Amino acid sequence: MAAKIFCLLMLLGLSASAATATIFTQCSQAPIASLLPPYLSSAVSSVCENPILQPYRIQQAIAAGILPLSPLFLQQSSALLQQLPLVHLLAQNIRAQQLQQLVLANLAAYSQQQQFLPFNQLGSLNSASYLQQQQLPFSQLPAAYPQQFLPFNQLAALNSPAYLQQQQLLPFSQLAGVSPATFLTQPQLLPFYQHVAPNAGTLLQLQQLLPFNQLALTNPAVFYQQPIIGGALF
């Protein structure tokens, strides 16, 4: 009895599966078309060969859909590479225009920097010499570098020998401020002060009185006791 019931159920199952089953032929395109995207449906219309060749045909169809896009990508890349030098040149032009506007806006400061450029270069090449120059007073620099400091002094532009002569007298002028007694004993100063004396006689008299002037500064009491000074002055 149980065997009959089992056979009956088997027959019912087979009949139900046969009623709902779909038969696909060997050359049918339904399974492949359902798996591929819509834009490849035309490429697989001829796929009705052996199932072993179907993956190869699908690969060819996919490659055929991608290859038309490659030339466009290559053209865009080459165009970008050609535009890179133009972009670099444009950036340089913009930078040059900005620097030019900065120079025009502050022309005085730019000119001053250009005039001091030799000293800045000396500072980068020889730091010791540059620091030594920085320690010098500003009024002594034209004596060492008359060409660079020529625009800063009108006397140097009009009469360079007189300007250089004044620069040579500068150390002695500083000596006069520190020690007047030592300043008056400098014999090398007499030729520079010839223009002060009205004539040669007065200049000679000043030269003869130079030791006594030194004595007057060091010891005024002894100076007034000198008979030579009394006879010379009175």
Swiss-Prot record:
Keywords: Repeat, Seed storage protein, Signal, Storage protein. The lineage of its organism: Eukaryota, Viridiplantae, Streptophyta, Embryophyta, Tracheophyta. Belongs to the zein family. Zeins are major seed storage proteins. It comes from Zea mays (Maize). The alpha zeins of 19 kDa and 22 kDa account for 70% of the total zein fraction. They are encoded by a large multigene family. Structurally, 22K and 19K zeins are composed of nine adjacent, topologically antiparallel helices clustered within a distorted cylinder. Residues 1-21 form the signal peptide. This is Zein-alpha GZ19AB11. It comes from the Eukaryota. GO terms for molecular function: nutrient reservoir activity.
